[in-house]
Design a protein with these regions (language model features):
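Catalytic histidine neighborhood in serine/cysteine hydrolases
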Residues: 187-205
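Short alpha-helix in the alpha/beta-hydrolase fold that links the catalytic acid
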Residues: 47, 151-154, 163, 176-185
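Short beta-strand/loop motif that positions the catalytic acidic residue
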Residues: 160-162, 167-169, 173
Length: 233
């Protein structure tokens, strides 16, 4: 069972977090903060599956709820509020275990917000919006654009990330295909793209001949573990 924490976001509100660490496995020395997507909080099957699976592979995994999810609201807050929440969580985790390599990331929206706080600010950005210092960023299903709106790219900040970035993407993801991500990654400083052949935005494969979802997810977890291991070497 994960340890449960309460993290104060400001003087009036705290959000819940969970820490997954499997004492039976060899510790990698790395922590991954994994943020949820827009439609489901940290207790969704996807989030719990990945938190448990990655902790079984030697990572210390921290999940949390963005404020809107903690409050039971369906619509996400605007990006500045999401970023501020993620920054508070990152600062708390770093203060708690400063000796560990710190990675941030998430599913879909959670991964996008992680990339945004890891990116260097543009001239004129507000104070307090500088890049958080992390060992790397993991995006599981990066939402490059809204479905059916490929002209509305969410990529301007990505070249400003100096830390290594791993993007795991379904080849049939309506939020961004391998072809669409290619030119974006070419402009990034240290980016790795892992494609799930036939995969959708949830990294699942819908065809009848596809492997079971847990087998696909296990392969993704192995990819994340191996990538983190190479980064911290």
């Amino acid at each position: 069972m994960p340890d449960r924490l309460s993290l104060a976001l400001d003087d009036t509100f705290a959000t819940s977090a969970r820490v997954y660490q499997d004492p039976s496995t060899e510790d990698s020395g790395a922590t991954l903060i994994l943020a949820h997507g827009a439609g489901a909080g940290q207790t969704s099957p996807f989030m719990v599956s990945f938190a448990e699976g990655l902790s079984a592979r030697g990572l210390r995994v921290v999940t949390f709820n963005f404020a809107y999810s903690e409050q039971g609201r369906r619509a996400p807050d605007r990006a500045p509020k999401l970023e501020a929440c993620y920054r508070v969580v990152t600062e708390s985790v770093r203060a708690d275990t400063p000796e560990r390599a710190l990675f941030i990331g998430g599913k879909s929206m959670g991964g996008r917000i992680a990339t945004q706080i890891a990116a260097a600010p543009e001239p004129g950005d507000a104070a307090g919006t500088g890049a958080v210092s992390v060992s790397g960023v993991v995006a599981l299903g990066y939402p490059l654009h809204p479905p059916g709106r490929p002209e509305k790219l969410r990529d301007a900040h990505l070249p400003r990330i100096s830390a290594p970035v791993l993007i795991v993407q379904g080849a049939r993801d309506p939020f961004g295909t391998e072809t669409e991500l290619g030119p974006v990654l070419a402009r990034m400083q240290q980016a790795t793209l892992h494609i799930i052949d036939g995969g959708d935005h949830s990294l699942s494969i819908r065809r009848k001949s596809a492997p079971p979802k847990d087998v696909i997810y296990s392969g993704v977890m192995d990819t994340v573990r191996d990538w983190v291991g190479r980064v911290v070497e």
